[in-house]
Amino acid sequence: MAVKRHTAKPEAETSANESKLASFCGWEGDTLILNVLGTPGAKKTVIGKPKGNQLKISVTASPENGKATDYMVKFLAGEFGVTTKDITVVFGQFNIHKQLRIKAPKKLPSVIAKQLAEQN
């Protein structure tokens, strides 16, 4: 059975690559858009709970020159069953507020699968 995917509609003030979502995640074709609230320098690297329109993700890497974001992308690549090249940081490379585009994820972490199921 095919997965039903909704297209997020960018609003006027968003750039060509930036999407506004009703929740922390949504589909644009086969690409998953994910709004993230990152926590660098954490004790454990984990996908946390939603906080507003962002998903909390903690990483152990320090917040120096985008290292925490790079580490987060590597971690999420494993969680979604994709390569790091399949994940694009739309904005927030050097900030805790990020938007990621994950092309054709092969698996979904439970918190994301639950949110997407509720959107359908």
Q: Model-derived features: where do they sit?
A:
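Contiguous, often N-terminal, cationic amphipathic patches that form binding interfaces
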Residues: 1-74, 82-84, 88-94, 99-120
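The alpha-helix within a helix-turn-helix
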Residues: 77
